[in-house]
Each structure stands twice: as C-alpha cells, then as structure tokens.
C-alpha cells in the first residue's frame, strides 16, 4: 500500500513539474504582452535595475500545476486505493481542500498587490495594513476550519515537550502564520531563491506528512515541490519571469497551512528556518536602525543618522553586497533548508 502511495506521489510531482514548465511557454509572452513587468525600486541592489520589466505573476505556473496535479493524484488515490472503512487520514480530503483554499486566498492578496504595481503603476502595491487585515481574517478562518475538522488541541508541540496554552493558542498561531507567510514573501528577492528553498521545504513536509499518515495533504506538498521545480526552468538566473507576490504568498500560505496540519511547531520552525531568518534580518535591521537613529537624535538633535547591522536586508541582499553571486546564494540557502529539513524528518521519525 505504501509503495503504491509513494508511486502516486512521484506521479503527482512529475505531472506538476510538466504543467508548470510547459505553461511558461504561453504565460511569459502573455505577461509581456499585457505589460505585467517588475518595477525595481531604488532601495535594492543597483545591479537589479537590469531586471526592470521582467514579467511578474509567474507564480501562476506552480499554482495551477500544484492544484491540478493534487486533484488528479487524489482522484487516482480515491478511485483505486482508498479504503472507506479504514481511511488513512481522518478528514483527509477536507484538510486537503482547506489547505488549498487557504493558499489560494493568500495568493489572491498577492495578486491584488501585483496588479496594483503592474497596472496602477504604484510601486508599493497594497498598503501594509490592508495586507495584514486580509491575512488575519484568512488565518482565523483556517483555524476555525481545522477546529471543526477535529483539530481542537491548544498545545504547543516542541517534539519532546508540549504545553497547553489554552485560548491563547489561537492568537499566537495567527501571528506565527502571518509572520512565516510574509517571511516566504521576503525570500523572493534573488532569481530562483524562493522556488529552490520551497522545493526542499515541501519535500520535507511531504515526508513528515507521510510519517504521520496525513497522506492526502502530503500529495499537495509534493505537488507544490514539483510545480516549483517546473517554475525554476524559467526563474533561475537570469530569470525570464518572477513569481511575484501572487506566487510567494501562495507558497507562504501553503507552507504554514501544511505545517499546522502536522501540529508540530518545532518542525515548522526548523523546516522554515531560512524563511524565518530572512524576515528576522529585516526586523533586526529596521529595529537597530531606528534605535540608533533615536539615540543619535537624543544626543545631537540630528535626524536619520541610524546605523545598520547588515549591508542590506533581507539577508540575501547582504550576501549579494558581500560579493556572493545569485547562484551561490541559492545553493547556500537551499543547502541550509536541506539540512534543517533532514533534521526535522529524523526527529519526527524517532518520536
């Protein structure tokens, strides 16, 4: 049975790869035709200016690929290998649908952001508070869905220790979901980076979902991995298109949704460590700059004289400024994700 489940997942990942890779042939020229190009802000590395006009919303490649491949894979599983009386995962289909809907809704926020940038020519897109409000509502809805699907635990699970925080679990999880999903968005700043790291994180989540018998959700995770691989055909340096916020918010949403299904919060942090460090570098940079600027103002009365810890944030830009090539950054960050992913799998397997 497990051999057949493994075969189905391989088929799902290959199908997602093919759909994503081939869809770029039609999607990229179309995005160029309607002038959906990237606007490069002056605050980024100067050499990124050459990427001005590169099509955005390429994330539709792996969004469509992962949804279609998951649906096909689940249909095959349901028709030929699903035992109604001995379901391998309680409420598996509903959990799968919940993850998909959550990811699509997050992607819709990203689409609105991309649309405003590309069509309205407003470089910053949606305002931060607008994104936060929509993300908050979607996260609350997802947690409510999980609750009615039977996931009523309010314990923080750190593998070898867990503790119940009661009603405070829900606001904490909303904050964690918003933080990590936006962290994935921040990781999309170098050609191929977010896609490559996500391939690794989704493969890790696939394995963990298989271990804990969340087989339906594991199908979605491996479909995203395959879709991202297909997208990388067009996104590795020099990128022919970018995933845009449409894609990165979809990946962020899917990562937190699938991670919450595993109900292992330590593994969420370990597997998503690259994302978390990317966002943390921004928090540290901004906080330190504001603190030192405030201290300088108190001493001298001059404004805007803050100091920076990194040459630029998120941290992948710091490495760029230090002379790392985009390829080297992608390989290094992906290797870090691979190491943390393997550690997570070993920990889960030995619990």
Regions flagged by a language model, labelled:
Residues 1-32, 63-111, 115, 142, ...:
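Alpha-helical transmembrane segments
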Residues 41-55, 121-134:
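Juxtamembrane helix-capping/reentrant segments at transmembrane boundaries
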Residues 28-45:
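Membrane-interface loops
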Residues 126-151:
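Internal, non-catalytic "lid/hinge" segments that mediate substrate recognition, gating
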Residues 119-127, 156-163:
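Membrane interface segments of multi-pass transport proteins and intramembrane proteases
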Residues 37, 116-118:
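Membrane-helix interface/capping segments
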